[in-house]
Amino acid sequence: MKALGADVRRTQKSEGMIGAQGEAKTYAKKYNALYMNQFGSEDNPNAYTHTLAQSLTEKLNHIDYFVAGVGSGGTFTGVAQHLKDYQVKNYIVEPEGSVLNGGPSHAHDTEGIGSEKWPSFLNKKLVDGIFTMKDQDAFNNVKLLANKEGFLVGSSSGAALQGALELKKQVQQGVIVTIFPDGSDRYMSKQIFNYKESNDYE
């Protein structure tokens, strides 16, 4: 982003996305800039309803279950709203430290998903279940997907796979669709393929 001329502001990891959003709002007000607010704009889920969701039902003959991570909630909400019309059951994946499953909020290393509060446009009626994943499982899957499938994904994708695998144990059969929303190229400066929970992941 810096190479493209962006003014990059970093916030404390302990502040989570709430801290990042606060910094963005302050910046927008100070410099009369546009704050896109993916966490509050209905354009976020609507974009997925009219693109990804329709693509899934057009290209796949049948879907029984949909599994996706939730950060802003845009992907899950937009896709789940559409899939409910097809009697698909929809499941959220979150890391430990996210509050969607009722647990306490704390820092986690799985990036791109996890919420300190319930996203404003995430309708609870769309949610058929929530899987809370350990960071280590997410990163183990990052390495597994690279080694076995040649997929270079990020930790939120590893968590999504873990959620799909956990669901598979429960349902025995049926078509499960999940989303890999990020690539490992975004995290090459970190130890993404050699993650250890006991080490600092910076």
Where are these regions (language model features)?
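Glycine-rich beta-alpha junction loops
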Residues: G40-S41, G71-G74, E94-V99, S105-H106, ...
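Active-site/ligand-binding-proximal alpha/beta "capping" segment
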Residues: Y31-G71, V79-K84, K124, Q136-F151
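Active-site/ligand-binding loops adjacent to catalytic centers
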Residues: Q21-G22, D85-S155, Q170, Q191-E202
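Short, small-residue-enriched loops and turns at beta-alpha junctions
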Residues: E15-M17, E42-N46, L100
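A short, charged, Gly/Pro-tolerant segment at domain boundaries
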Residues: F39-N44, V177-M188, F193-Y195
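A glycine-rich helix N-cap at a beta->alpha junction
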Residues: M1-Y27, S198-E202
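Short glycine/serine/threonine-rich phosphate/pyrophosphate-binding segments
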Residues: V70-A80, S156-A164, Y187
